[in-house]
C-alpha cells in the first residue's frame, strides 16, 4: 500500500522496492500455480458469502499466515507499479470472468472457485485502486507530489539506508 504514496523502487531499491516486486510475483504464482485460480490478488477484504470482512492472502506473506479464499482487485491495482503487464492482464481477466465491475468501479472481492462476487465497495480498497491508477496513468503523479514536500525530501533518502536483501 505505501507504493501509492512513495516511490519505493527509487527510495528503497535494496529493501521495500525489491520486496514489492517479490510480493507481486509470489501473489501471482501462489494463486495461479498452487491454487490453480484463474486470477490472483488475495488480501484482507470483504467476504462473498456474508456481510463480513476477513483476512485472505498468501500464507508465506502473512505474519500469522492467511487462509486462501477470495481475490480482491485492489491487490492487482497496487501491482501496476511493479508488474504492470501482469496486473493489466489480471484486471482484464477479472472483468471477463466475473461480474466484478459495477457502476462505481470494481466490487471488493470474488471467490474465484465459485464465482460469487461481494457486490459492495469498500472505501479503503477503492482509494488504493484510485491512487494506483492515478499513478499508473499519470506518470506516478501521487508519488511525485508526495516526494516534492520539503519534509518528505528530508526523510525519503533514509529508506536507502536499510538493506535487507543482501547476503
Q: Which residues make up each language-model segment?
A:
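Ser/Thr/Asn(+Pro)-rich, low-complexity disordered segments
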Residues: 1-167
Amino acid at each position: 500500500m505505501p507504493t501509492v504514496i512513495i516511490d519505493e523502487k527509487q527510495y528503497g531499491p535494496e529493501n521495500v522496492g525489491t520486496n514489492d516486486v517479490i510480493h507481486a510475483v509470489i501473489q501471482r504464482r501462489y494463486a495461479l500455480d498452487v491454487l490453480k485460480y484463474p486470477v490472483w490478488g488475495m488480501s484482507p477484504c470483504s467476504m462473498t458469502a456474508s456481510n463480513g470482512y476477513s483476512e485472505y492472502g498468501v500464507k508465506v506473506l502473512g505474519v500469522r499466515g492467511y487462509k486462501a479464499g477470495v481475490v480482491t482487485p485492489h491487490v492487482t491495482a497496487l501491482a501496476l507499479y511493479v508488474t504492470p503487464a501482469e496486473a493489466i492482464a489480471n484486471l482484464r481477466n477479472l472483468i471477463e470472468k466475473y461480474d466484478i465491475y459495477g457502476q462505481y468501479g470494481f466490487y471488493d472481492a470474488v471467490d474465484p472457485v465459485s464465482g460469487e462476487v461481494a457486490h459492495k465497495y469498500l472505501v479503503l480498497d477503492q482509494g488504493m485502486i484510485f491512487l494506483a491508477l492515478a499513478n499508473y496513468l499519470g506518470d506516478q503523479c501521487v508519488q511525485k507530489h508526495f516526494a516534492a514536500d520539503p519534509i518528505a525530501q528530508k526523510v525519503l533518502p533514509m529508506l536507502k539506508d536499510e538493506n535487507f536483501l543482501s547476503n
